[in-house]
């Protein structure tokens, strides 16, 4: 069963309301995605903890329809410095 980029975006925004979220279906099959999640909730957290926050937001979708998810998780300040 596939999941849409819009559904992924909505789940992340529900858990991290301040987040700017961009999601791409990298294969067109609804199971491989790349996402950039920019949130102040990431301030003071390392990459693993940032990813855990996103995985928690996606819940059971990480064990089901999402097979692969490439994440970029900058804070707003880190994103502005790019």
Label for each model-derived stretch:
Residues 51-82:
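C-terminal structural segments of small proteins and small subunits
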Residues 29-31, 78-79:
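Short, active-site-adjacent cap segments at secondary-structure transitions
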Residues 30-32, 37, 64-66:
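Short connector loops at helix/strand junctions that flank enzyme active sites
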């Amino acid at each position: 069963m596939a999941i849409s980029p819009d559904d992924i975006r909505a789940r992340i925004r529900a858990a991290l309301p301040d987040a700017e979220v961009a999601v791409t279906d990298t294969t067109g099959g609804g199971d491989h995605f790349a996402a950039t999640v920019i949130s102040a909730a990431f301030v003071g957290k390392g990459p693993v903890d940032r990813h855990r926050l996103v995985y928690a937001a996606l819940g059971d979708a990480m064990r089901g329809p999402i097979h692969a998810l490439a994440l970029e998780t900058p804070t707003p300040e880190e994103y502005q410095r790019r």
